[in-house]
């Protein structure tokens, strides 16, 4: 068995967090790493808890496991009667498992209940330098705090519950630097969509990505979470941003963040969580923030994306036959014609929410577009806050009234229309401006057509009835 590296060579942020968590490296096997926080929800945990019961095992560290109900909960009612039979079984099973194993649960009646990747950070469960896992592919969200966070499968969920460790191969490192500052109307969602458009859906495969540069540093924690949330959409194992004063200001005073003298000690340690001068990455990508316009997807994966002032791409212009065929297939499904201005594309549904864009900053941005206006005739638009805390804050600021007066539906927290796993889903043929993270075929409902955009772009589309360039009057 080998021991963790004690090299004094310059290290990347990822390498520092990784090295601090390697428990053992058995010869010829994947390293074993320690897990600081384990987040669970109702969909990927039942089999894991069942496996523990069959084996007669207890949780290794129940105090480091946090559960919520989010994926298939209703955003119309907090009553169990509002759930489908399968959804009700899943939430009731999670409640019983948490009771049996001593796990802290934020159920549908708890004021802090919400989407796992919204709730965790706002409670201070997510901290810099920690390893965080969850049975959900968008766990990379927490990397915005300088944590190493990634999704795991159900069998791995069971393993972490039982041992608080995980076998994991070390990833390669990639630096994605966004230089300069974005212009007005360009958000974190536009930045990450532009990145995916540049490197493709598989450009980050095998890597842990560190996002850096002036444009990233200028983002709020909400914005950084949006960027890291979609690291998986470029194929990356995880995404990370080095913690700084913005991070510390966000975390201070939150329920599970260190307090008193422990806080000062923690911040001192967190300040060392940055890539050393001279550290080498396996790959690097650079974007100029000034070149990024508001983005939206035109096809059936997040990499099929263009600027709002561009037309629908023409597959005939693509030299690679495989990519060309993929573009043709996407256009056929999405029902668009090459050369059509994206501002001419009409929508009939709008979804503002998801673990990508349901935080208070996102809702403020959308409300700014909606204030004093009305949702277009024939358009149904819903706003789903990411957690009970976000909902309460938005209502305290009067954002709910702005949305309701404009004709939007104001809902309860949950994953909602991000995925067709609950009652919020699209019908075949619907075209939706969505602030979620995936636009795959059928993602929001069988035959549904999804265009990924920022909250501001989604709200503007709801008002206009079609996509608009929010940098211009409409």
Curated annotation (Swiss-Prot):
Keywords: 4Fe-4S, Amino-acid biosynthesis, Branched-chain amino acid biosynthesis, Iron, Iron-sulfur, Leucine biosynthesis, Lyase, Metal-binding. It is an enzyme of class 4 (lyase). Its EC number is 4.2.1.33. Pfam families: Aconitase (PF00330). It catalyses: (2R,3S)-3-isopropylmalate = (2S)-2-isopropylmalate. [4Fe-4S] cluster binds at residues 355, 415, 418. The keyword Amino-acid biosynthesis applies. One of its GO terms (molecular function) is 4 iron, 4 sulfur cluster binding. One of its GO terms (biological process) is L-leucine biosynthetic process. Binds 1 [4Fe-4S] cluster per subunit. Its cofactor is [4Fe-4S] cluster. Pathway: Amino-acid biosynthesis; L-leucine biosynthesis; L-leucine from 3-methyl-2-oxobutanoate: step 2/4. CDD domains: IPMI (cd01583). The keyword 4Fe-4S applies. Belongs to the aconitase/IPM isomerase family. LeuC type 1 subfamily. Heterodimer of LeuC and LeuD. PANTHER family: 3-ISOPROPYLMALATE DEHYDRATASE (PTHR43822:SF9), HOMOACONITASE, MITOCHONDRIAL-RELATED (PTHR43822). Catalyzes the isomerization between 2-isopropylmalate and 3-isopropylmalate, via the formation of 2-isopropylmaleate. This is 3-isopropylmalate dehydratase large subunit. The gene is leuC.
